[in-house]
Amino acid sequence: MVDIVKRRDWEKKEKKKIAIERIDTLFTLAERVARYSPDLAKRYVELALEIQKKAKVKIPRKWKRRYCKRCHTFLIPGVNARVRLRTKRMPHVVITCLECGYIMRYPYLREVKQKRKKAT
């Protein structure tokens, strides 16, 4: 009985590991293709999101901010995305998708705090 439970746990972990590898591969392909074929890059992102939902895994942090949450376009700063730093209230990065106009805000307070600690 214990062996069956261990095997199930191992299978779940293995499936999640494979899913994360595939997601990473799809995002890497999207990054390569995005400049000359944005539609194909968008399809790669959509496939990665489908895998993520099916396998119930999180998208790796390095890819999470590289696509538009609304239209699933792979974002390239200066081409189809505008990136701005804002310091009012709480310091944050503003990424605007130039395809659909969606605005994403990400705080960077943690980085500012680390910088202050190093300065003192």
From Swiss-Prot:
It is found in: Cytoplasm. The keyword tRNA processing applies. The keyword Metal-binding applies. Changing R22A: 40% reconstituted RNase P activity. Its EC number is 3.1.26.5. Zn(2+) binds at C68, C71, C97, C100. GO terms for molecular function: ribonuclease P activity; zinc ion binding. InterPro entries: RNP4, Rpr2/Snm1/Rpp21. Binds 1 zinc ion per subunit. GO terms for biological process: tRNA 5'-leader removal. Gene3D superfamilies: 6.20.50.20, Immunoglobulin FC, subunit C (1.20.5.420). Its cofactor is Zn(2+). Optimum temperature is 70 degrees Celsius. It is an enzyme of class 3 (hydrolase). Keywords: Cytoplasm, Endonuclease, Hydrolase, Metal-binding, Nuclease, tRNA processing, Zinc. It catalyses: Endonucleolytic cleavage of RNA, removing 5'-extranucleotides from tRNA precursor. Consists of a catalytic RNA component and at least 5 protein subunits. Forms a heterodimeric subcomplex with Rnp1. Reconstituted enzyme missing individual protein subunits is suboptimally active, showing each subunit contributes to optimization of activity. PANTHER family: RIBONUCLEASE P PROTEIN SUBUNIT P21 (PTHR14742:SF0), RIBONUCLEASE P SUBUNIT P21 (PTHR14742). Part of ribonuclease P, a protein complex that generates mature tRNA molecules by cleaving their 5'-ends. Binds RNase P RNA. Belongs to the eukaryotic/archaeal RNase P protein component 4 family. This is Ribonuclease P protein component 4.
